[in-house]
A protein has these predicted regions:
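Basic/polar, cationic surfaces and motifs that engage anionic cell-wall
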Residues: 3-11, 82-223
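Active-site-adjacent loop/helix surface patches within enzyme catalytic domains
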Residues: 1-123
Length: 223
């Protein structure tokens, strides 16, 4: 399952945050406004309306507002599931997360990390439920993803996050290097070139002025 190239614009991104929609197994209209990529119950992928570009750097109008106060530099990927779910006692509701969805999520996140050269750590690849603990940004009791209905032995945000990261790293290891631009490296190179283009005339004038001053001082001493 390959992500279409136009889903991954060439911009710097810092992290991937994974969610569930608390909805049906299909992507709703509201879901498409909130996330960059959605994974439906059968593993099918749906592109959200906001481009990842809008969340690069300072957020821009129309960005994907998927995580409170943590949208800048963050790619939002969400599983379409868990409508009516209850945290305690745990009840996955009528639309539980499926193993097929989870497996598709792993591939999607691995592809994003590979393309954007995001190193997999608890602060760069995490679930919404981990944001408050891992990044120190309050999230008002969000618990997605802290349970895997298809595997009841995995309980808690940290356990689910560790499973996510472990599987993403394994998937990345089996992926070939993508023949695409590195968003972070290319963006930095472009910014550096623009800065150099702007500064070079100033530097040249400064060097010229300094050289002329040096010549005048030498001539004074000779005379």
């Amino acid at each position: 399952m390959a992500l279409p190239p136009d889903w991954m614009p060439n911009v710097p991104m810092k992290r991937v945050i994974c969610h569930w929609t608390a909805g049906l197994h299909s992507a709703g209209e509201t879901d498409k406004d909130a996330y960059h990529i959605l994974v439906e119950g059968n593993g099918g992928l749906v592109r959200g309306r906001p481009s990842i570009t809008l969340n690069s750097g300072r957020v821009k109008s129309g960005y994907a507002a998927h995580t409170l106060n943590c949208n800048s530099g963050s790619i939002g990927v969400s599983l379409c599931c868990m409508a009516g779910a209850e945290e305690r006692p745990f009840n996955a509701g009528q639309y539980p997360m499926t193993r097929t969805q989870w497996d598709a999520l792993i591939v999607v996140v691995a592809a994003l990390c590979k393309y954007y050269r995001i190193k997999v750590t608890p602060k760069t690849v995490l679930s919404h439920a981990e944001v408050e603990r891992n990044l120190g940004i309050e999230q008002r009791g969000k618990w997605d993803v802290s349970r895997l209905p298809f595997d009841p032995t995995v309980v808690g945000a940290r356990a689910c996050g560790d499973r996510l990261r472990q599987q993403v790293m394994a998937a990345m290891g089996s992926m070939p290097d993508l023949p695409v631009r590195s968003g972070r490296d290319a963006a930095l190179e472009t910014a550096f070139r623009r800065l150099l283009d702007e500064l070079w005339p100033i530097l040249a004038r400064g060097l010229e002025a300094g050289f002329n001053t040096l010549v005048r001082e030498i001539l004074k001493r000779i005379r």
